[in-house]
């Protein structure tokens, strides 16, 4: 496992007189760069086009201004908020020896006023305050996001595209069912291979064939569904091909190990289990399977699921937990769930989250150990044969 970093605060001593600090508010068509330059009383603010080379020149120019003011710059620290642009700029700046950090968007505290002023200039000031506190090593100013390599980002694409295509296929099928229901036809399975050939023989309750415009719409939907189905199969075949070609390569080993326990192994490995997690609490927190306490004075209540982490992992684990109760009913975890919900049916939704959290932590421990042995796999869980 790679060495873990504390992303909640900086562990490097901040020499403010020798550190050039900059934050970037990244827009679709322009970037607003705000800086703290040692020796310069004004705090510069510069609007740039979406141009990384111009950004680098600006940072070098500010460094020259600081050196002219008698401050030798030893460190340039840059930060921007995680968002649509991803991590390419952070990787590019790091490659040019610029220390770059990506701020977790939801960790930045904002004013609770009902109508607060919000402009790019004000937001860069807010980011500067957060980043400066983080650089000083103070906690709770903001949190940073681990910057993945381009290979790690690319490894997530097949699963995410597969999820998107499956959702699109479901939407097309549901739309076809709704179209047929409008003319009184029910029970038609649009997923059958010969479904398109059967359309001409369908009749409405009045004994009439499907109207021509509706029939044409259904045929176009079937073409779209067939195309999406082929693309889903291509993704699944490519995934099996990668596992076959490099069975002992890092994440692929994890996938083959987890495949003995769960069918969502590839998604879990790429989204969470290949990441460096400090402990089981960090694993549960990343998946958003933790609670949201609301405590003040004598009030003690729970607001429910935090939902602050990776939604794909959270959704997949809760689905897996329900299936686990069906297919691993003799396991210790399934018995634990039944013992706590047997006389409290209203607690099932709460306890399924707890079961999902326990399962995720058990899978994380299994991947960390790298072998299937007693004490790692939960008691009573039946494994598939190794492949």
Task: List each language-model region with its residue ranges.
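A detector of single, family-specific signature residues
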Residues: 1-387
């Amino acid at each position: 496992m790679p060495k873990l970093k504390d992303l909640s605060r900086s562990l490097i001593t901040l020499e403010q007189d020798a550190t050039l600090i900059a934050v970037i508010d990244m827009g679709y068509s322009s970037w607003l760069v705000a800086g703290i330059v040692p020796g310069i009383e004004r705090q510069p603010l510069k609007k740039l086009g979406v141009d990384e080379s111009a950004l680098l020149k600006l940072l070098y120019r500010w460094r020259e201004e600081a050196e002219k003011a008698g401050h030798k710059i030893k460190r340039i620290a840059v930060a921007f908020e995680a968002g649509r642009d991803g991590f390419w700029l952070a990787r590019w700046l790091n490659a040019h020896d610029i220390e770059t950090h990506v701020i977790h968007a939801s960790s930045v505290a904002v004013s609770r006023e009902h109508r607060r002023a919000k402009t790019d200039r004000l937001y860069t000031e807010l980011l500067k305050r957060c980043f400066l506190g983080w650089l000083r090593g103070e906690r709770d100013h903001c949190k940073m996001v681990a910057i993945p390599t381009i290979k790690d980002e690319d490894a997530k694409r097949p699963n995410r595209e597969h999820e998107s295509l499956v959702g699109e296929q479901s939407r097309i099928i549901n739309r076809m069912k709704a179209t047929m229901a409008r003319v009184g036809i029910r029970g038609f399975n649009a997923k059958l291979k010969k479904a398109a050939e059967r359309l001409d023989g369908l009749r409405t309750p009045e004994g009439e064939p499907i109207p021509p415009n509706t029939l044409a719409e259904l045929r176009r939907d079937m073409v779209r569904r067939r195309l999406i189905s082929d693309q889903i199969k291509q993704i699944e075949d490519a995934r099996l091909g990668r596992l076959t070609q490099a069975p002992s390569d890092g994440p692929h080993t994890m996938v083959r190990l987890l495949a003995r326990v769960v069918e969502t192994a590839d998604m879990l490995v790429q989204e969470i289990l290949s990441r460096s997690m400090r402990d089981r609490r960090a694993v549960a927190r990343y998946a958003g399977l933790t609670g949201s306490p609301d405590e003040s004075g004598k009030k003690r209540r729970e607001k429910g699921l935090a939902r602050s982490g990776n939604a794909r992992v959270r959704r997949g684990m809760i689905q897996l937990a329900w299936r686990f109760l069906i297919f691993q009913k003799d396991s210790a975890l399934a018995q634990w769930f039944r013992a706590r919900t047997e006389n409290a049916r209203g607690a099932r939704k709460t306890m399924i989250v707890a079961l999902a959290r326990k399962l995720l932590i058990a899978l994380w421990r299994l991947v960390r150990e790298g072998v299937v042995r007693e004490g790692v796999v939960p008691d009573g869980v039946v494994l598939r044969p190794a492949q």
